[in-house]
Amino acid sequence: MTRDEKISLNQLSRFKNKFDLISFSPKRITVPKIFDKTLHFESKYFKNTSTYSRLLLETKFYEKFANYKFILIYQLDCIVFSDDLKFWCNQEYDYIGAPFFRNKYFPSFGLSRVGNGGLSLREVEIFIRILKQKEGPNFWNFLFNKLPDKSFLNLKKRFAVYREISRGVKWYTENYTLNEDLFWSDRAKLFYSNFKIAPLKVGLKFAFDMHPKFCFKRNKNTLPFGAHGWQKRDKTFWLEILRDIND
């Protein structure tokens, strides 16, 4: 475990004795004692980002947490600044994560949508329900209710999307090639229209990912609940924050 991962794990300790801390990993991996329980999955899911995404698009993953209403995904490049996880659970969103940017190089282009899955809160029952959907969306509902832009080019693109999602969520997730959080941010609502994704303003209060200084200013100089990718996204900024709150 790297020094940065130890920092992330130490921040997670603020939840100890308040919530169940459960790790998931392949077998024969030594897990830190901070965790209350470890769930093992096949090693094929831990080879790279793509295989990890495959696991988080599997029903069996969420069924392991069927006794919980929510799970907080906390990768070891995350930090949290408070223990108010219960507050976020009480907001009753199905999915909350740090907002994506419209352009990852130019934050001035603005935020896009929620959100990054590295530090994310997920409503277990709803995730299972979506992944067990047998049919794709109704064509006319998809066409007219999901398309604010009715231009020809947009329609052409959306027809292609519909052709794929009409095969059902099982086929779609098995053939999905992007990171799993993009499915939950962009596609899940097509299979379950009541899927409640937190709006941008709420997502920003929950977590930062890229361009933390920009996000901090946008969030009225207020820290969020946590952050993802802190050691990759202006590490100096985050180390100063950690020194201030841990003094």
Explain the meaning of each model-derived region:
Residues 1-53, 59-70:
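N-terminal anchoring/stem segment of glycosyltransferases
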Residues 23-24, 75, 97, 171-173:
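Short beta-strand segments
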Residues 25-27, 39-45, 97-100, 188, ...:
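Residues at the C-termini of beta-strands that transition into short coil/loop
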Residues 33, 82-85, 131:
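Short glycine-/acidic-enriched loop or helix-start segments at secondary-structure transitions
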Residues 68, 93, 192-194:
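Short, high-confidence coil segments that cap the C-terminus of an alpha-helix
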Residues 68-80:
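Short beta-strand-to-loop acidic/aromatic patch adjacent to the donor-nucleotide binding site
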Residues 78-112:
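Conserved donor-nucleotide/metal-binding helix-loop-beta segment in metal-dependent transferases, i.e.
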Residues 116-247:
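Catalytic core and acceptor-binding pocket of nucleotide-sugar-dependent glycosyltransferases
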